[in-house]
């Protein structure tokens, strides 16, 4: 399996090189040149680690399959408390794929607990011995998951940049208290798009690469622009489907819809890849909050980032520049020239419009919708009161949208974070007066619902804060060169 840039068909690399580089030299993203076909009958009874090995081996063909099996077994064992790919029935025809039972209580753990192993092995595969410096822009959950995955690894340094005042207090403390001599964390005076734009600018700056090369350092990314972030996320779509069949909730071969709360389009794109591999996926439903640039795009074919940026109670989706959409555009248009043109238009004017054929292909696989904070809060309350099911603010957005687009097909909502990462907003949605402290809110939410508080979150206020530096977006370049 080879990988090419979305913007230049002549940029071809191995999977190891794609994972190590993160971003293509031309600014494009690496995509597979083909999709391996799933062996559904053979895979349906596999454990989560066994299934992960099969999916990974189809794409990462320059990795030893035995290594991939060992890496998956080491990743998806005790750290996920036996709940990797856990599917919970909410009510008839509606299910929640709970992806927050990992060490940092967010779906990012599925990729970022495994990806460090893939990166270290990629360096071995390619005979690379330099230090790898990983730059991460985060809207909240990616930062902590990446820090937890890469902390303490020899030959690896990681720098995380998050929007100051753009995360929950729990998310901020998860990053600011991270242990490890090879980690650095910076708050950025701006929003996620500001951080992501300047991180991508650093990757494209030849002078940065030249200076770091003198010091035997190369840059890489742990954001979902890196193929190594996407491929592990394909696994849980297959696993969820197999569990629904096993439980008697879905007939074998029956299409299932998946509703995904997304901002950067990576999680839902993994579902598209699963569909291309042969999983019976009906519609992939893109759920947005008030920052509904993706909703508008899927409906109209015009991507227009020239709009007000809103801070919402679902901050991990507060994004206007959705990086992974570029991969989908390449797959449905089949034209790197078109993609390069659209991305140039976006950089220059803040918008682009795709052709009618490309839009029709997108709409054939994707539906969409959006929900604001008020609707999300009402959904949290409704799901708890009607179904005794507690969800976080991001998952609530997906439940809202799922209700508006549901067909007769079973619907799986991807639950992307623990409700205890946003305890004040969840508690308020349940009609309670939320304390000022997130930790007091955690305790009150536990009393209200009886749902256990994840241990990794409950101890955060006892850990020393190591990082409290706030920088301007333009200073990300200096941090990368430190």
What do the PLM-derived regions correspond to, one by one?
Residues 1-482:
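PLP-dependent amino-acid enzyme catalytic core
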